Amino acid sequence: MIKVIASDMDGTLLGNDHKVAPETLKAIHEACDAGIRFMIATGRNFKGAMEELKETDIVCDYIVGSGAEVRDQKQQIVSTAPLSMELCEEIYENLKEFPVSIIFSSGDYDYRIGTKKEIEESFLKQIQLFHMDTGQDTDESAVLSSPLYRRIVENTKIISEFQELEESQVSVYKVFLYSNDLEMLEKIS
């Protein structure tokens, strides 16, 4: 007997339009009505996951931040596994000389270190790299006017140096970096 259904969000629960299809929502409700527990398992932080689900009536458990935070059906934190600030600093110090975007993810916000202009450029690159289909208009004005761009901006705290992250005493659950320079990324790993 099935007791739990866990679903990823991007490309699984959410379609290309970043919405839950009506037939998927119906299936989730039918499973829950049959006594099967439903949960979201995603690399997103909790706030980012909730942003995508706000127009649904899904009540579920959450495994977010690639497993670093677990929340119950009432959205209360059940457990966390944050990275130590020392490890975050070591990662940052080892990567800061490379031309990559480094994102420190917490339960509520993503923290990016740099100037406002640098970070806004990184938003643009992120969307063009990961979120735009090859058939979509990927020019700067199309990206800047997209709802996805607005969500990324709203879910990001821009800080000028690592010390600000340390002083914020936020729990970092995941460090994410990206670049379209695959050769350089290979050197880092």
Describe the residue ranges of each PLM region.
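Small/polar loops that bind or transfer phosphate-bearing groups
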Residues: 16, 40-41, 177
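Short, Lys/Arg-enriched, disordered terminal segments
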Residues: 1-3, 33
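Active-site phosphate-binding/coordination module
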Residues: 22-139
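Asp-based phosphoryl-transfer active-site loop
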Residues: 3-18, 91
